[in-house]
Amino acid sequence: MLKIDMWFKLKSLGFSLISLQALLASCSAVSPVPVPIEEKNDSTTDNNATPFKDEQSDQGTEVNQQPKVEQKVYNRNFKFNTSFIPEESDIYRKGYDLTFTLNFTSFSNDSYGTGWLIDWKGDENTTQKQGSFFAYIATNLHVADGLRNIGDHWPYSKTDDQREFNEYESTVYFSIGKYTNKTDITKLYQEEKLEQRKVNDSLLSIQTSNIPKTAYTATNFLKGVNSIKPVYADFAVIELELNLENLRDWQIFNEFIKPAINTYKSLGDSTNIFETKDLEQHWNHSHYLLGYPVLERGYDQNRLLEQKEEFARTHNFNQKSQLWSKNTYLVSTAKEIPVITKNARKDGQIGSEIFSKKTQDSHVDKVIKHEKGIVTFQNFKNFKLKYHDKEYQQYGYGLMLDDTNLPGGSSGSAIFNNNQKINSIYFGVLEVYKNSKTHKDNIGMSQLLRTSKRESEKNKTRTTNNRDKFQHYDLIFGDSNTKSFYAQFAKKHNTHLYDQIKSSEKEEFKYVDKNNQKTPFLLR
């Protein structure tokens, strides 16, 4: 009889990585969507399902009524805080301002993740409801896999083997949401000329007029990698084109994106918001993240939303406008919704600490190789996923966050350090057990976005289990080891981030302008 004394699983709901000792799945939430039996044309609405109807637009807004502020219990007595809007002085406020819940729907599944503003293109100060504004939202690669748009930027408009997305897997609906105060929600009701209702602070989710596109994926991002499979970091950026003449797109721009831009600039703007440190410098920091996992709503609460309605299945999938619309309201009995959530540590302190060896016989050390909570992903051959049907091996470096366990839907959350700089992106949780029964640790996992070149110099005089083959990389601005990075897209499309690169005097941000760097589209 085979007895496994110690084991762990790294879980989320987006993908699975399986070996004898580990199960990895990402913290995105995915639900199957039944294949529709009855087809409707694009003018059909279900008037019997709604107490009143929105005549203003064919895009939709969800308002999920507030559950009571409380401490939720998830997964073997792990606790976290939900349903809150941080005060201006709260260390979580910057993350709140930048962060959104994302919902991708196809005819085959309904998936949720978390994203945050990384860049934009257009006049953020405009008061004119005309033209387009582009917002760029960072998230996980496995969350971005839920976006399958036949009108996407090349090469993302097809699978890796150039197969076109079929109608069941193509994204037909997208919305972006945020936990919002009741004053702003009341204003939205007035703008929509809807029946006034008493509302609390609630999750507000708004459908965009266009299906998003893919700006960047961290696939095959490293030079000189010795790997059987192509490599990935769990990071991607999606592009939202907002038509400011459209009421709902204007609401997204005015209520979500503009406040996020103000916060982004207050944090130092593009060239000051992202941390790059030697690996051991992460050890002494606390790390702060909040996201939008999909959780069970309070039983005494209703969810007010606009109904997803299906257009005719013969609709032209090449057009960029959305194929589903939420254009009627109803009270839904949905038991789970995205809920703004932050970690609640067992010791009552805020923020997450790096996992470190607590005893010489730590059970964690026996099942996962790490150096004081710093992980080298290429040491784990089962850390892999499929993006658009192609399998990738995870590479790069990450943080193990002690006593951290946010459920599915939180994937893509930005992680801030003590200096209010973003150092990594959250993608899953490692649940460690002893004797296959007793829960021992909840360890959140994140992918570092930038690593210091100084590590390579240190590596010449030191060899450890995790750093004997260290390769620095920079997924945002690029460096000599990184062949695919976001700034390539920013340069090609002349976004705000590239404007900041041009105006910076620091060489570390200028790599995109050296050696005629290719765009990431050629490097998938």
From Swiss-Prot:
Residues 58-68 have a biased composition (Polar residues). It comes from Mycoplasma genitalium (strain ATCC 33530 / DSM 19775 / NCTC 10195 / G37). Belongs to the MG067/MG068/MG395 family. It is a lipid-anchor. It is found in: Cell membrane. This is Uncharacterized lipoprotein MG395. A lipid is attached at residue 27 (N-palmitoyl cysteine). InterPro entries: Mycoplasma_peptidase_DUF31 (IPR022382), Peptidase_S1_PA (IPR009003), Uncharacterised_MG067 (IPR022381). A lipid is attached at residue 27 (S-diacylglycerol cysteine). Residues 37-68 are annotated as: Disordered. Residues 1-26 form the signal peptide. Keywords: Cell membrane, Lipoprotein, Membrane, Palmitate, Signal. Pfam families: Mycop_pep_DUF31. GO terms for cellular component: plasma membrane.
